[in-house]
Amino acid sequence: MRVMGVDPGLTRCGLSLIESGQGRQLTALDVDVVRTPSDAPLSSRLLAINEAVEHWLETHRPDVVAIERVFSQQNVKTVMGTAQAGGVVALAAAKRGVEVHFHTPSEVKAAVTGNGTADKAQVTAMVTRILALQTKPTPADAADALALAICHCWRAPMIAQMAKAHALAEQQRRSYTAKLKAAR
């Protein structure tokens, strides 16, 4: 499975591509950070992110895109920019029929470090170790994008099992409801 991990942001948007093998074997294929000037109009910044993501989707053809879910921050402007960048990425993937999943920062930290409250240095160190990289990925947005892809690779089997369980439960609920109606 090829997973494109995205750490969304207007100033710096981290992009990564990881391929999963058997078990927990992972290979980093590419990583980059899209930068946009803070003084540029919002529409220009979002367009630059969209163009970079479109290029990545065309070049790398991921099976799934994993995006960091925006969480509450004190700076509303930062949250809005992050959400807008994430929306641009999700839309670009959806237009190509690529599955999109969102993961919270604590899910990513827990998957990569075993600690949902790990700091950036711990996440970067574990990403470097897990992927057997020669140097630490910089800036932090690159490491975070890799961590998102790792998280999804390792959580995907559980996500699939949960989806099957929910579908089965819904099917059984409908069957039971139909039997109740027939018995009346």
UniProtKB/Swiss-Prot annotation:
The active site is at D7, E68, D141. Its cofactor is Mg(2+). The keyword Membrane does not apply. It is found in: Cytoplasm. It catalyses: Endonucleolytic cleavage at a junction such as a reciprocal single-stranded crossover between two homologous DNA duplexes (Holliday junction). PROSITE patterns: RUVC. This is Crossover junction endodeoxyribonuclease RuvC. It comes from Mycobacterium marinum (strain ATCC BAA-535 / M). The lineage of its organism: Bacteria, Bacillati, Actinomycetota, Actinomycetes, Mycobacteriales.
